[in-house]
């Protein structure tokens, strides 16, 4: 907590927060949590983490690891609930088999009007 109180930059728990039950023990120690679907396992658990974090007056970041467009499209569904978003994992893939919502050159995440997550398999 000493480091947090002296830092002008928000301190965000990443690997320490895998499920909603982790959030209460982090409250007061960090400013927020970084939610990654790869860590928590589902949109449902991610939403639980958001709700518990907000109940503890914490910030929420939606992040990713090295992820395909399919995984990022799912994570984008949580974007309206987040303070910060870092969903650029597909930009690092040479052979992402999916196409759909993507990171624009100006840094915006662009959703499309397709049904569901708006993701399709790239033609071969």
Q: Could you describe each region identified by the protein language model?
A:
Residues 1-2:
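Short, small-residue-biased leader/transition segments that mark boundaries at the very start
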Residues 6-12, 16-88:
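Catalytic alpha/beta core domains of metabolic enzymes, predominantly
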Residues 65-124:
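Flexible C-terminal active-site loop/helix
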